[in-house]
């Protein structure tokens, strides 16, 4: 516990908010290149093979893991993708999403509902 005098000399510092998607550098989206596309398993109560990609962000080259949403994808090594923030709760270390229907990432096939989230045009 500091004394009043100590607080007068050096006031308390307010803690700055933690950035949840630091690799985006305060941008809404960033372009990235896929380094490795693979599947991984989720945390304890859930069971699946979740599709993820290790991507290298254009401009300054930091590598992050991004989730590939939707059923089926056409991504492979050297695919250019657009990533956004947003974690996947049951995959530790996955703090970014790949935007479907932008750049090399194709929209989800035969998608009828929630099309805007998966890059599908109205048919």
Curated annotation (Swiss-Prot):
Q: Which residues carry this modification: 3-methylthioaspartic acid?
A: 90
GO molecular function ontology, one term from the record: structural constituent of ribosome
Which PROSITE patterns does the entry mention? RIBOSOMAL_S12
Read off the Gene3D superfamilies from this record: Nucleic acid-binding proteins
Going by the entry's taxonomy, the superkingdom of the source organism is recorded as Bacteria
State the UniProt keywords alphabetically: Methylation, Ribonucleoprotein, Ribosomal protein, RNA-binding, rRNA-binding, tRNA-binding
Write down the Pfam families for this protein, in alphabetical order.
Ribosom_S12_S23
Its biological purpose: With S4 and S5 plays an important role in translational accuracy. Interacts with and stabilizes bases of the 16S rRNA that are involved in tRNA selection in the A site and with the mRNA backbone. Located at the interface of the 30S and 50S subunits, it traverses the body of the 30S subunit contacting proteins on the other side and probably holding the rRNA structure together. The combined cluster of proteins S8, S12 and S17 appears to hold together the shoulder and platform of the 30S subunit.
Q: What is the name of the protein in this document? A: Small ribosomal subunit protein uS12
Q: Which organism is it from?
A: Ehrlichia canis (strain Jake)
